[in-house]
Amino acid sequence: MKIILVNNRFKENTEKKAQEIAGQLSALNVEVIIDNGLDEPYAGTVDFIMVLGGDGTMLRAARRYGQRAIPVLGVNMGTVGFLSNIEINELAEYLPLILREEYSLEARMMLEVAVFQQQSLLTRVFCLNELLLRSNSPRMLSFALEISGQKLEPYRGDGLIVSTTTGSTAYSLSAGGPIADPQLDAFIVTPVASHIINKRPLVVSPEREISLHLLEEREAIIGIDGQIKMDFGAENRVLIKRAPHPLLMVNLKAKPFFTSIDRSLQRQ
């Protein structure tokens, strides 16, 4: 068996814990690859990915490995663990189940984001939570949204979020978007501080494609899962669609979504 341990190199406790777990697994004849984000994603064949950290580390792991149909387990060592299934102090209890592959998988839809300059593709990124288009200055943006070729009336405001249902409890929620069942495949389109009062969040079929471009020359940026940022101008266009493969999230124990999210939000 070969396992990738993904950790956060900016947090010393996850670096140390990754080395400790790697030693334990090696003693059980498990080959271990440690990924702290410095190098390119490991390209070889692996059986399992264990993510040590919080939601940010899980989002990075999803971008790097989510399109390879490898089971991914989130082990929470951070303050926010919406995407984790177990806590670090539970790992010893559940490790035998991992090695025997006795767990269930939950498929989470991911986004495929393609950014163009005129007709040329600049970059293609996969993400689990959301794409954000927002102004990079105090001025509002004016931008166009198309859904599978259907042109909507122009938007004006601070920006727009296109999220998965997994991402519905992240930035989209704070902007007034709905909480969506993560087992549902859909796009959640949420305006950010819309200047047009009747622009409401949309729930869109994953079979559609969403296109965004600016209507004026403004300083804008695109953010991917809160971790990747790129400049976005009037000559750019972004196309969002469902990624070819979902993220396969490992469930070792029951973690009821609506009960968990309700408790988490009540504590905030």
Swiss-Prot record:
Pfam families (alphabetical): NAD_kinase (PF01513), NAD_kinase_C (PF20143)
Domain of life: Bacteria
Any one GO biological process: NADP biosynthetic process
Hydrolase in keyword set: no
Cofactor requirements of the protein: a divalent metal cation
SUPFAM superfamilies, sorted: NAD kinase/diacylglycerol kinase-like (SSF111331)
CC annotations in GO: cytoplasm
E.C. no: 2.7.1.23
Keywords: ATP-binding, Cytoplasm, Kinase, NAD, NADP, Nucleotide-binding, Transferase
Subcellular location(s) of the protein: Cytoplasm
Predominant cellular place of this UniProt entry's protein: cytoplasm
InterPro entries (UniProt xref): ATP-NAD_kinase_N, ATP-NAD_kinase_PpnK-typ_C, NAD/diacylglycerol_kinase_sf, NADK
One GO MF term: NAD+ kinase activity
Reactions performed catalytically: NAD(+) + ATP = ADP + NADP(+) + H(+)
Annotated binding of NAD(+), by residue: 55-56, 60, 129-130, 156, 158, 169-174, 193, 227
Active-site residues from the entry: D55
Family under the similarity heading: Belongs to the NAD kinase family.
Function: Involved in the regulation of the intracellular balance of NAD and NADP, and is a key enzyme in the biosynthesis of NADP. Catalyzes specifically the phosphorylation on 2'-hydroxyl of the adenosine moiety of NAD to yield NADP.
PANTHER family tied to this protein: NAD KINASE
Name of the protein: NAD kinase
Gene name of the record: nadK
